[in-house]
Amino acid sequence: MKHLVTTALAYTNGPLHLGHARSTYIPADIYTRYLRLKGEEVVHVGGTDNHGVPITLTAEREGVKPIDIVDRYHNAIKADLDSLNVSFDTFGRTHSDIHIETAQEFYSKLKENGYIYEKEIEQFYCEKCDMYLADRYVEGICPFCEGEARGDHCEVCGRHLEPTELVNPYCIHCNSKPEIKRTTHYFFKLSAMQDVLKEYIENSPEMPEHVKNMALRWIEELHDWDVSRNIKWGVPIPGCDDQVMYVWIEAPIGYVSFTKQLGGIWEDYWLENTGDSKISHFIGKDITVHHAVFWPGILKGIGGYKMPNAVVSGGYLTLENKKMSTSKNWVVWVKDFIENFSSDYLRYFFMINAPLNRDTDFSWDDFQKRINTELIDIIGNFTHRTLVFTERKFGSTPIVDSNQLIDEDKKLISKCESTLNRVDSLIREYNFKDALMEIILLAKEGNAYFQGMAPWAIKDDERLKEVMYTCSVALKYIIYLLSSFMPEKTALLLEYMNEELDLEVRGNPLKKPKVIFTKVSDEDISRMKENLLAATKKAETKTDEKSKKVKSGEKMDIIDIDYFGNVDLRVGQILEVEEVPRSKKLYKIIADLGDEKRQIVSGLKGAYEAEELVGKKVIIICNLKPAKLCGVESQGMLLAAEDDSIVSLLALDRDLPVGSKIH
């Protein structure tokens, strides 16, 4: 049987943290490595998700293009995965020709099969910016906890929100209150799939039970799915000029488009009637429904595609028993971890700490304890003492007649064989914790055997060879089974044994072994704790210093004169005015500030004709961070007063030269 293993597409709006590694990438890599170890044909598919509003927001804040953000974090994410020894056969990106073409083919086929239809919806619209606002472009007050919230989520209480639920909503670009307008979106008729999806889930024997239960609950109340968005950055909807495909309809198609990068063999893994293959999706718990309901619904709607056999859903990770938060820097980034510890230690800790489907915690103290008292004191102890003693006594692994082994020897070798079978079953069931526990138990048996045989006291050379041969057999089994979990450390063990990654003991000359498993020191842990607290305090300081946004109709907080002095207000003169393409409200203005000229985008269209603005002296905020409105960069802001529909530029009552400072 062929295997296709996929990992959730990493979102290119930041690097990877430990939560990503635990839920998705490490377990998928362990599973893939194990299948390869057993000689099975497997393709591991990964990549990055490059579209959606968070990326456009980051780009606007930094004054760059979305593709610049995508390129930066695609490369950073791949570097993080490489540092974790997570390897792929193909690693793609959704902002690529092959993906856009494949996604549009899927969409067109869904439409052709009658699963796409148009429907009017209500959506926030900003008059000043002349644009419909996606959920992340609206912020306001959470109606449940009264905390600051985004249009899709409240960070304070954790609730999912609709933008229209917000109290005092405002556009994040201009702070004005948006209005609700009707617009046409495209919907996927997912409700028509209810019976088909229920049958699929109920008849998927390899689907984990917790995933089945979650999917079946959703299927009971299945609704059609809005699959279009009024933004520019994304996969264009075929035949539509002003909307793109919602990321959750196009991103999973990346599993197909990225496999296509391997050439014609992609059909063997994805298309029906092309042979026996198994598809396993490794994801985080928060996107279980997307992969167990929405994605299979798309595949059923297309027709002719194989269905996922298993959606392997990893639980949430907390940090020191608190929810991780990237905005508060309460997070451990993969890069920071790898700069201080072996990636194998992280792979071990995450897989032994809890079953994959359960939520778990990362604590620096627990990490130190499990590495030092479990991995090193049990596995490290057996591997090191076996290698050191054998190399010192014989220089190579002894080979003996297995018929001469005594019962105690045969018992340990039998334990090796039963562990091999048990681990095989557990890994194929995605039960990585119990599989790793079996390896630890085998190492415990090895330590007990070594201690019981007391090879240092054996005078008979032949008997000593039998004992160390038996220990070497157990060591080979441990290395073989542990190699998928800890590829770096097991590669070093094989190097010292001068052996291949298999179960055969060849009697090769040994290299003088060094300590492979080094303990995590108290100083290491103290340093990491201090770094975490320092990063959190830095984030808190930034939050405190950040000026509060003023919403329409609200009074401003009282500020002191020093705070006001941070605003660079100057007299400017408008030189040129032209309309912003496809905008009903915006002008692109070139203003003279005396020592330089600035381009400013302002929502004065409708309030002033372009000709009457030319030559006017105005007041300009000059030290605002550049922002893009309708794709045009604005390098400042004109001051104006507004009352309902009346807009008036602030003017001087005496003539002053351009560039004059306002105090």
Curated annotation (Swiss-Prot):
It catalyses: tRNA(Met) + L-methionine + ATP = L-methionyl-tRNA(Met) + AMP + diphosphate. Transmembrane segments: none annotated. The keyword rRNA-binding does not apply. A motif ('KMSKS' region) lies at residues 323-327. ATP binds at residue 326. Its cofactor is Zn(2+). It is an enzyme of class 6 (ligase). InterPro entries: Anticodon_Met, Met-tRNA-synth_bsu_C, Met-tRNA_ligase_1, Met-tRNA_synth, Methionyl/Leucyl_tRNA_Synth, MetRS_core, MetRS_Zn, NA-bd_OB-fold. It is found in: Cytoplasm. PROSITE patterns: TRBD. Its EC number is 6.1.1.10. HAMAP family: Met_tRNA_synth_type1. Homodimer. Is required not only for elongation of protein synthesis but also for the initiation of all mRNA translation through initiator tRNA(fMet) aminoacylation. This is Methionine--tRNA ligase. It comes from Methanococcus maripaludis (strain C7 / ATCC BAA-1331). The gene is metG.
